[in-house]
Amino acid sequence: MRLSSLLALLRPALPLILGLSLGCSLSLLRVSWIQGEGEDPCVEAVGERGGPQNPDSRARLDQSDEDFKPRIVPYYRDPNKPYKKVLRTRYIQTELGSRERLLVAVLTSRATLSTLAVAVNRTVAHHFPRLLYFTGQRGARAPAGMQVVSHGDERPAWLMSETLRHLHTHFGADYDWFFIMQDDTYVQAPRLAALAGHLSINQDLYLGRAEEFIGAGEQARYCHGGFGYLLSRSLLLRLRPHLDGCRGDILSARPDEWLGRCLIDSLGVGCVSQHQGQQYRSFELAKNRDPEKEGSSAFLSAFAVHPVSEGTLMYRLHKRFSALELERAYSEIEQLQAQIRNLTVLTPEGEAGLSWPVGLPAPFTPHSRFEVLGWDYFTEQHTFSCADGAPKCPLQGASRADVGDALETALEQLNRRYQPRLRFQKQRLLNGYRRFDPARGMEYTLDLLLECVTQRGHRRALARRVSLLRPLSRVEILPMPYVTEATRVQLVLPLLVAEAAAAPAFLEAFAANVLEPREHALLTLLLVYGPREGGRGAPDPFLGVKAAAAELERRYPGTRLAWLAVRAEAPSQVRLMDVVSKKHPVDTLFFLTTVWTRPGPEVLNRCRMNAISGWQAFFPVHFQEFNPALSPQRSPPGPPGAGPDPPSPPGADPSRGAPIGGRFDRQASAEGCFYNADYLAARARLAGELAGQEEEEALEGLEVMDVFLRFSGLHLFRAVEPGLVQKFSLRDCSPRLSEELYHRCRLSNLEGLGGRAQLAMALFEQEQANST
């Protein structure tokens, strides 16, 4: 009885018990097999990965690991086989197979290329990664900033067929969506980009304003070309083999109808106006209709507006839609700010934790006195925080425009808040303060003297303080021209008679850093003679320099060091550069250097990457070592309060003892990298603005960097260069220099003597010597 009841209880668990027993038995049996075949090297390898091993085999493995010696298989390339270079893509995006979202193709013609097509380019080009214009005109001249593709045949079907073929061949692997439109269409670019971002790319989609064919069925629809249409990449890939057949079989006077029939006949795909909950909305603009007075929902929500008869109408439509987008953005900001205010009450800090402006980060909180952000004081004409350390300098350029914009915004906000009861007019700026907060943006505090006018015409002067904030916007990647490190660099070394003794050391460093590693660089020596030097019967002061250059040419066959002789009473850097510029092509990359500079491969590569033709000039800031007499190799610590020791030169070798300190010399601008074409353009602009005697006087007070800064529209990139380390030397400050250049030269010499600790110690030792 008990046995039957026990079996009844165990009957549900019998399969589990039998399965566990069978599994354990098979596992034990497998372990015995593995232990019996321990001599098999394959089994030993399996045991190393985690299988059980016996002690003897493990001991043998440990012993073999100690005696293991790797066998190095050398690689020998067969000289009979052609060498195949590994092709690396220019961008990692290409290697990963990533694609851009949207490409826009605009169909234009000979009559509208310079009018409507230009208007389209100015209104939507900055919203899309690529915008192409296709025309049947042969040899069409492209307006500035536009990429035009000419097919040479203006027949509608031919133009559409060649456009699709071009898109497939050149951009089929780079974009997910292709939007085709006419040049008489205005497109709301942000909405179109958002639409493409919401659609799935793994589908055959033909999206636009669906129209019926004449005499065709209800299912056969094409997308009207006047309102534009989207083609998916997969559909374009499927359509490509059928283009030639459609061009011969389908006759149509309109390119959009031809494309619609080709898609239906070859692939069975028709146009749709709605897909995945996204509807393509368009608006047909009536003739002589004013966009400012149009307020229908169809117009306000449209992706495309057609037809646009002239360029001015295109700009008016763009103004109208931009204002609508701006109002919508302001409305969303106000709603978000209201939600933040409501939620802030529920936080532990309460309303005290609400920052101004609402929704932006709180001001930066300094943790020590070294992190306190200072305010810069300014007026409408001057600023009292200058880059060169001067106490006062004129407010000009971008800073003046920034202050003017802040004043206009302050007055506009005051009038918007108090109108129509009060109206304010600015009389003058009493005080202005601004600072840059890295957590928020640029902050302004303005003390304004205002004239207040009431509705009854009463006037009164008021002084009010206004606080403004220009917040940091979204970080954007600016497109830059592509540059490489394969560009040849032409070094230019102006040499005065006083610098001739240091030239052989420069040439030896040039040979070791440039000629030995076979850098793609050349050197031109510009020998500057004085009015009474190097004449007939007089010794040549540059004889040693010429001999050293000839010796380098002998040591390095194929190397040619060119030199030019110039006679000048007061050598100007710009005049010397004029001489060199005429001897080289316009695409030459110049590296203007000094006899104390030691350029190396890294410096030359940064010169190649930072100097961009037609875009940017690069003027590095070199590291100047201090006077060894004041900054010995192992200088003792300075007196209390003298400040920290000066920094060591970049790249110093600590094994050679404590290096001499130094600083980055911001006052010097003798080194520079720029293209000859950019220099010639800036020089021509200087000659056009300054003529005659005024130009001659200006050249005496200008350096090459000043020419680019004042007479060129290029970006001027000025940054520290750790690879340019110069030994201490006192610059020859000629009294013929302009007042500004002479001041900069003297300041560079004084600041280059030593750091605060070294100068304080030198004064202390001098006082001790005088007292004894």
UniProtKB/Swiss-Prot annotation:
Transmembrane domains' residue ranges: 7-29
Tissues of expression: Ubiquitous. Highly expressed in placenta, small intestine and pancreas.
Catalytic activity: 3-O-(beta-D-GalNAc-(1->4)-beta-D-GlcA-(1->3)-beta-D-Gal-(1->3)-beta-D-Gal-(1->4)-beta-D-Xyl)-L-seryl-[protein] + UDP-alpha-D-glucuronate = 3-O-(beta-D-GlcA-(1->3)-beta-D-GalNAc-(1->4)-beta-D-GlcA-(1->3)-beta-D-Gal-(1->3)-beta-D-Gal-(1->4)-beta-D-Xyl)-L-seryl-[protein] + UDP + H(+); 3-O-{[beta-D-GalNAc-(1->4)-beta-D-GlcA-(1->3)](n)-beta-D-GalNAc-(1->4)-beta-D-GlcA-(1->3)-beta-D-Gal-(1->3)-beta-D-Gal-(1->4)-beta-D-Xyl}-L-seryl-[protein] + UDP-alpha-D-glucuronate = 3-O-{beta-D-GlcA-(1->3)-[beta-D-GalNAc-(1->4)-beta-D-GlcA-(1->3)](n)-beta-D-GalNAc-(1->4)-beta-D-GlcA-(1->3)-beta-D-Gal-(1->3)-beta-D-Gal-(1->4)-beta-D-Xyl}-L-seryl-[protein] + UDP + H(+)
Enzyme class: transferase
Region feature Disordered, mapped onto this chain: 629-662
Ranges in the topological domain labelled Cytoplasmic: 1-6
Protein known as: Chondroitin sulfate glucuronyltransferase
Organism expressing this protein natively: Homo sapiens
Name of the gene encoding the protein in the UniProt record: CHPF2
